[in-house]
Amino acid sequence: IEEEVAAAAAVGSGGXHHHHLFHHKXPEHAHRHKIEEEVA
């Protein structure tokens, strides 16, 4: 899972990011991850 987070962060707001959110199926995690990318 950690590797997927790093990969999604590297891709940014690309398609892999959306796949990452659907993969976890966790609203809280998805929202948190999205905010982290916007701040970064």
Swiss-Prot record:
Residues 1-40 are annotated as: Disordered. Signal peptide: none annotated. Residues 1-11 have a biased composition (Low complexity). Residues 25-40 have a biased composition (Basic and acidic residues). On the 2D-gel the determined pI of this unknown protein is: 6.0, its MW is: 21.7 kDa. To tomato abscisic stress ripening proteins. This is Unknown protein from spot 237 of 2D-PAGE of etiolated coleoptile. The lineage of its organism: Eukaryota, Viridiplantae, Streptophyta, Embryophyta, Tracheophyta.
